[in-house]
Every structure is written in structure tokens, then in C-alpha cells.
Amino acid sequence: MLKEENWAIKKKNPFKRRSNTNLTTRIKNCKKIIGNKKYIKVGFYEDIIKSNRTINLINFFYKKKKSEIYFLMGADNLVNFHKWHKWKTISQKCNIIVFDRHGYKKKSLNSTTYRRLNKKNLKFIEFNKVNISSSQLRKI
């Protein structure tokens, strides 16, 4: 049972030219989504850890919490995960939970990342999907 979830908001996806919404709006929208679930903490950590690298955020949480880390991503991100800074180290330090995204299952299962990852640290979650991107979700 998870005791706490940390939803780390980034200024922007490094693989996209720009973000459709500003940071303050995204944080506000995320807090609205979680409602009164006190175990979910929404935060912007880049200023605290002085980095926008995922591996540095994971190291920060690991040192702070000394607990098992589950890293959640969409199947669309798994396709390009091998391009992330220190992606192999991230996969060694975390259990990676991948949520299927419409149109990405086959691509993600055939990706360089999927072929190279240790499958015991990787769980692929399928669920009733809605064909909507995270950018579209934020506009709701």
C-alpha cells in the first residue's frame, strides 16, 4: 500500500518546444484533479533540487524518504525513454509503471527501452483508455 504519492510537475517536457500552460496553472489544475486526497503531494521540485533531470529528482526522493520508488509514465514516454538522461539508472532505482496510451502499446513494446529494461522492475498497466493527451487533459 502506498503511503504517499508525489506528483512532480515539470516546467516543460524537454522533448517539446513549449508548454501549452504555465507552471502555476498546471500545479493548480493538478491539485484540482486530486481533490482532498491528502496522500498525494503535488509539487514543483526543480528549484529545490537545482535540476530538471528526472534522475536528480529520484535521488532527492530516495535520500529523503528511504523508500521504494514507483515511477509512473505513459506508454508514449516509454517509446523515447532511452533518450532521457541516465535512463538506465532511473530504471534500476525505480519500479516503472507504464500506463497504456491509445495508439502507443505496440510502439512502446517494440521500443529500444522496452527491449533493454529489466522486466522485473517494469509493469505495463492496461485499462479502459480515453483517447486524450496530457496537454488536452490540462485544458479540461
Which residues are covered by each model-predicted region?
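Nucleotidyltransferase catalytic core that binds NTPs
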Residues: 1-140
